[in-house]
């Protein structure tokens, strides 16, 4: 009997287009969650939404089918179950709400723009220049990418534009110069390591400057509200507070990733000579390379809000608008064509799966799940009677780790941060409130490390295929812990020296 069951399982596993074992596990998770009693304080439909969200995450982790298919599954199940509406028309409208998100289109267009770097050869040229300067060791190239992030961060309010639209194309070009390409199965040479450094520099620099990511001003506003305006961070005070722990994180991060996701190529002693020889063969920049570099420079200036600094706030442009301007310029100048846009599969794949995850996260908030979670956390801490140190630790960890439920830092901060800050103000002695607030501010960026959908930058880099999901989540969790420890220990001492507590 057992032999027959095994044979039947193997047969179906070979004929169905999905992995049967993971599919059965995912189905069991969904059924189990739906059979559990609805937690007090949640409506049945809200609990059904939680079940759909968690099942989708499990299906993605177990790789039942490609992530885009799992996203479509989530849309179908949510629409049929009508957990967000009283009709299928309302449910499908809810399921598709995130696809008009400017953030998603910023990601898609940034991927499309990066195609121009490859097509024109400018990306290869940049990669070779980079290698000719610092290409003797792979870890040195990693530090170079981190420095690029650091230099751009104060002037680029969109961390997605910075990490995914500016630095990532350079990283891909460097990887290609070493013949490290996911399409060839050679991503492990240097690509996986450099992609991880490319990504993990992004949350660190986002924490270091008020203008390095969009939700930081909201964090400042919430801190001021929670402390009744007694702690109001300016651009300068934010940068000063985050300077030392942030720089230490940037110093440590490439080394930690070097251990967690080591490149197959460690030393590249001949790379500098090779790069210089290849640059000599390429000759001067072609007209299309000049157009591409000019467009790239324009994007950087507009993403850094330079026109607004010079001419006033009426010249502020949304990062997504800027991205579309860049894409349009590349198309009308013939630098890329419409077939290039249509054939960039990773952009459209990202549109589907990231849109679905953002939609699920937004619906969790709308259905009151996030508020319920926040209130339950507050109640549990108050009832436990634990000391203020443990309270602060639990609040920071709960806030950061709950980002597994979110596909947007702005949505997470908007939904939960003020509630957590308010609890902290009530339960932590006044003289220790400031370091708690600064830890929460740092944590609001550090939480980006956790998943491949944590912020707009992550799906761009993950979608390029250099890093598996298992590696991404493993490295992400370790880096989250390391960075939190650095900010908690070094940051707290630094803030004491600065007189914040």
Tell what function each PLM region has:
Residues 177-183, 242-246, 355-360, 370, ...:
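C-terminal transmembrane helix pair
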Residues 1-106, 226, 230, 236-375, ...:
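Hydrophobic transmembrane alpha-helices of multi-pass small-molecule transporters
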Residues 160-176, 195, 208-227, 270, ...:
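Re-entrant/interfacial helical elements at transmembrane boundaries that shape
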Residues 60, 197-210, 353-363, 426, ...:
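Hydrophobic alpha-helical membrane-insertion segments
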Residues 178-266, 457-490, 501:
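Membrane-core helix-loop-helix motifs of multi-pass transport proteins
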Residues 10-15, 38, 69-183, 344, ...:
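Membrane-embedded alpha-helical segments and adjacent helix-loop junctions characteristic
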Residues 107, 139-153, 179-206, 232-241, ...:
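Alpha-helical transmembrane segments of multi-pass membrane proteins
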Residues 27-31, 51-58, 145-151, 198-201, ...:
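Hydrophobic, membrane-inserted alpha-helices
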